[in-house]
Amino acid sequence: MHSISYFWHLSRLIYGPRNFQENKRAVVFFARAVSNRALFEELYDFFDHYEPMKGFFDQHDPDFQEVMTRVFLFKDSTMRQRLDALKHHFTILRTFFSDDVIHELYWGKGYTLWTSPDESLPLEARLIFDTGQRKEGFLSLYLYHEGQMIYHFNFRFDYNADGTPSMYIGTIQGSKHGLETTKVLTKKLFGYRPKNFILYLMRIFVQTLGIHDMYVITDEGFYTNSHMLRGNRSKKTNFNDFWLGEGAVPDTKEKWYFRLPIEEKRRKYGEIKSQKRNLFRKRYLLMDTIVPPYIAAIKALFRQGFDPVPSAIDEAAITDKPADYDPIEAPVK
């Protein structure tokens, strides 16, 4: 078992003597770590036997251990719950991806899953681990424009109440300075907002992995609501409106999450005003060019022998289309 002095030195390594707030956090980390040494030993034992993450805390990212002592992920989470979430995430992750891929995700720069070939639409989607985003999840899907982040999801894999591997999204965040860029991109994406576009990519990611259940954090469940006194540091983003607009529904088995459909249904002729049909047709044709290489890039990361049945088949994923293909289905007569 690690000594008390080990945890004191660790607390100073993570926080350092930078200011009063950091000193306070160092003391809190130390006190909580020492009083929960058995849980920390469980954490260390798990990662010592997890090949792609061996030495991660000592050699690469000691700050990641802060997940143990701070109320992250969701409202009022306990250290036991956060440790279980960590173990579940990495256990599930290893069923999907090879050890080399996991090592690159957490020790390296991650993977580009799609880059636009259109110079007038310089977008890139990347799957990465950003230690600064560990408060809401253990992996991120980023959307970049000209190398600058526009939106990103922070998420983790976990078992739902039925014991099924699922995705839990802890936040969606946008650039504070990306409003003007968002307007430009929405036009270039034929009316598709970048926020909705990255959600679409996330849904395709889930489908490709064969995951059937996708959960999204609610306003009430966001981790910052664990703290009674936060002043103007409280979360100002309204998640619920966006999720509900995308078809999310409450789930009696999930206290802090909505269940979100894993599919985004294409609108049909009867659901689109006649003057906007050409816009939607162009948008769907664009998605038809984006999704197949995006799926191929995801599958290239799979562990050998992992060949899941997609949990849904998006229309853009179908590459064998007839010559008279219309991205908007003909109206029912």
Segments and roles (model prediction):
Residues 1-184, 279-333:
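Non-catalytic substrate-recognition and accessory regions of acyl/acetyltransferase enzymes
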Residues 151, 160-250:
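Acyl-donor binding region in acyl/amide transferases
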Residues 195, 249-262, 290-302:
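Hydrophobic transmembrane alpha-helix bundles
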Residues 220-286:
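Active-site/acyl-donor-binding loops of N-acyltransferases
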